[in-house]
């Protein structure tokens, strides 16, 4: 906690520069030259100097350095009055004239010490000279206050009488009050005779309400004829111009300012290189303070790329403060879950292009839904995203920052070099996903949410889960715990439409698998060979139209076995020979083995690409023969009619054993009418049609090869299913036979 506090600017989150060592933009030299010029201005009349600059450009910092220079170079008769109407909230007339009256009062007492009765009452009496200033302030102010209230505010010498003694009454002022012109002349004479000079500094005028701005300019005009006054006003010209036009109901506020302000100095904009270089240096320093080590070369390279491209949009020192303060606030709590240059990128965009920041969060939110298979966007929604990005990018001044291709280096799924060819939500490769996840990148489905919400995405499991999953899989004694964990994820709703089990499968990518050792991968393979049939059963209960093929379990197991072979081919083959015989999911194993033999054309099929085969032809034949022996055993054949779907299994059995073996089993189970109906119920296939929706049918071309006389079977079924008292399953079979289209 102490270290985190030290990261902040102890003077404030947006504190201005107060001394030359803090100056990063060359304001010190500017302040020295301006202060020198101010001290040489003519004394015969009032002078008004304007320092102009946009919000956050460093006006207050420059002003602080000017004040420091004035304090060092002015003579004893020059008094600097720093007035902040925005902070005080009081009348600027009071804020100016009460300190002036105080200075005159003190100067008169020094030069003309009171004697006798006046010496006794000097704590309670204003000098005539100070009283003239108060009277002039009353005439100038837009609201008249009792004199005792003025006395109570302006002088530390007589402050204590404010609560009780009323020396001058309102009637006393009314009797002795002079005309404003005469008072001004007398005060001017006093200033000359006392050799007093005043430099009045007013900051943050652009933060005032329009009516307050008008009051400040009325004050400046009121003092315009007084000699020895120099006003330094700091403001954003555009804002002040609009405020004057609104408050005074005039058309051209700029022309009005020209009448009031005799000299104006526009704050030079810092060099773009200086701004982005400062951001990068402070960002690197922050990283080192938090991590106790400097960023590595790759991170430095990415940080330079971010600042050179998106840091070029920085226009004021305040924008740097805002971006760095955000990093100080966010990064310590999320450093283990984000990539620092990506976080810097987001904060730069948030400060310089807030609309793009909001677009990015919305885009990544929707992309997460699409990439995890939980939903999709319509063409209209995609078009809205596209138009939104085009609008956001047009606000960038820097040429590289407005490039879609440049943005695509940081935000995934973007392609196209101009508006016409811009595409969003483009798919990415599994390797890309893994690299981004490993690097904790903004483009990672696992980590993107941390960058916006201090937390992980609610629809994505964190990397820690998968680390623990593999570690558990690598310990044989924990196989039961592993199975319970994974099977429990089938019943847990992890997202809008899927389960955590499906999410886990989608995350078991080749990139993630390549980081694990042999035992860990073998443990997961063991789970699938033992429990995939149970997985299928559980999902079928949840969804009668469920298809195991769509879950990509086969692909995950292939990735695991491929990596295991790369580590130790002999151990992998030995494990496979064991699992195809002992694995408790023979129906899924049949499907997986059919994929393997098709890779080598062992089912009299066309070979897609032998180079993509998981095992060699010899090993595949050996595995096929061993599993065929298991399929031909009565123990397994007795379980077949317990399955809800058998057509795929029969084809796998045919490809690994023989068609005649399968037909012989069919003959045996169809010797009775009940057996025939039970078998055909399990030979239905699911169909999804755009005009009919989901339905089941008996695909005659797929089912008939397993029967000696299919037409005779159909005739028999027609008779059997023609009655009025059919079970729901028989009714479904009758409909399925009619649906063969």
Curated annotation (Swiss-Prot):
Domain KAP NTPase: 27-334
Record has Hydrolase as a keyword: no
Keyword Lyase tagged: no
Organism domain of life: Bacteria
Pfam families: KAP_NTPase
Annotated keywords: Plasmid
Gene3D superfamilies: P-loop containing nucleotide triphosphate hydrolases
Function, as annotated: Responsible for the exclusion of phage T7 by plasmid F. Growth of bacteriophage T7 is inhibited in cells of E.coli that carries the plasmid F.
Protein name: Phage T7 exclusion protein
Source organism phylogeny: Bacteria, Pseudomonadati, Pseudomonadota, Gammaproteobacteria, Enterobacterales
This protein's encoding gene: pifA
